[in-house]
């Protein structure tokens, strides 16, 4: 599941072009659970100032693309003014996480260690590539380590202990 958190708000996507003439807007969503948003979402926070807007309608147009109607946006011109703006929701409005899911912000800042207990460094970022996610680990006096986020390498993510356990293969951390 992909979510980016800022001050108890989760980034869920960006607004695109208007959809129709009555103020509906395309929402390019990164949510893994759009059906939860469609059923439960009532408020979104838009733009760098996180301006709250009440949602009057939200539905799936096609995978990854939702159509959103905001109560205060009633025409195509007003909808066009929001094109490109980032959309956030309150963390409490997100779908509950499954046992094997986590928020990216829970991982960033974790201590990375090998499965034998050797300290690697601190998780600085998670990059998304077309093939999957890459964990960026900052190491003292060495270049960052880039570790694919796959079960072969990431053997445990302990949110409570703030530890990411890696099973390195030869050359992975060199």
UniProtKB/Swiss-Prot annotation:
Q: Which gene encodes it?
A: rimM
Where located? Cytoplasm
Oligomer and partners: Binds ribosomal protein uS19.
Q: Which GO terms describe its biological process?
A: maturation of SSU-rRNA
Please provide, alphabetically and separated by semicolons, the GO molecular function terms listed in this UniProt record.
Answer: ribosome binding
| Protein name, per record | Ribosome maturation factor RimM
Q: Where is the PRC barrel domain?
A: 99-172
| Signal sequence range | none
UniProt KW keywords? Chaperone, Cytoplasm, Ribosome biogenesis, rRNA processing
Task: List the GO terms this entry assigns under cellular component, sorted alphabetically.
Answer: cytosol; ribosome
What coarse category fits the chief subcellular location reported for this protein? Answer: cytoplasm
Q: Describe the function of this protein.
A: An accessory protein needed during the final step in the assembly of 30S ribosomal subunit, possibly for assembly of the head region. Essential for efficient processing of 16S rRNA. May be needed both before and after RbfA during the maturation of 16S rRNA. It has affinity for free ribosomal 30S subunits but not for 70S ribosomes.
**Family, per entry:** Belongs to the RimM family.
Please provide the record's free-text comment about the domains of this protein: The PRC barrel domain binds ribosomal protein uS19.
InterPro entries xrefs: PRC-brl_dom, PRC_barrel-like_sf, RimM, RimM_N, RimM_N_sf, Transl_B-barrel_sf
């Amino acid at each position: 599941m992909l979510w980016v958190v800022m001050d108890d708000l989760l980034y869920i996507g960006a607004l695109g072009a208007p959809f129709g003439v009555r103020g509906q807007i395309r929402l390019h969503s990164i949510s893994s659970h759009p059906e939860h948003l469609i059923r439960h979402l009532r408020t979104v926070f838009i733009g760098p100032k996180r301006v709250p807007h009440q949602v009057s309608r939200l539905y799936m147009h096609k995978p990854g693309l939702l159509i959103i109607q905001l109560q205060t946006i009633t025409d195509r011109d007003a909808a066009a003014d929001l094109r490109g703006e980032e959309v956030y929701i309150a963390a409490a409005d997100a779908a509950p996480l499954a046992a094997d899911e986590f928020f990216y912000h829970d991982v960033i800042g974790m201590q990375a260690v090998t499965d034998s207990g050797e300290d690697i460094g601190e998780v600085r970022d998670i990059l998304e590539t077309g093939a999957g996610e890459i964990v960026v680990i900052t190491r003292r006096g060495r270049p960052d380590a880039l570790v694919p986020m796959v079960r072969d390498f990431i053997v445990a993510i302990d949110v409570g202990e703030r530890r990411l356990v890696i099973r390195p293969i030869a050359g992975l951390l060199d």
